[in-house]
């Protein structure tokens, strides 16, 4: 009788252990999803981008929303999404965000010159740092200055594109 009781106890312990594993993963998945939704609702843009780009988990959702991300193999190799491309009034490339900032790259034209623009934005999508450059006739990358009015115009376009991205991703994920 004692042997059967030990086997029964062992079977119960093993069953509880096997039940705990999927419950843990289900809880963990729900927790991550709720953290992302909370970041969306609090308008924490950097945190939202970080969660979306931290792994390949949301790559198909980002593609479904109409944005461009690297192929799944590259995402697995990099351990996450290194950039998201937004096609709009200007074609933006968002790099994986840092702690309190996100890098946005795009091209524009000013004075009939193609200019590469590099913005580092904070959570309110204001410019922390900016850099403008072009390739000269001698194939040398040179720094370019643009007017304050032009910078403000470009920033408004970038802010609109990023806000539209956030709204569309929220609708795609929780819609």
Regions found by a protein language model. Give the residues of each.
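Hydrophobic membrane-insertion alpha-helices, especially the h-region
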Residues: 9-28
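N-terminal export/targeting and maturation segments
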Residues: 22-105
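Short, Lys/Arg-rich N-terminal segment immediately upstream of the first membrane anchor
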Residues: 1-7
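Extracytoplasmic electrostatic interaction patches
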Residues: 74, 78-175
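Intrinsic structural disorder/low-complexity segments
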Residues: 10, 32-35, 121
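Short, flexible coil/linker elements and helix-boundary hinge sites characteristic
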Residues: 8, 34, 43, 56-57, ...
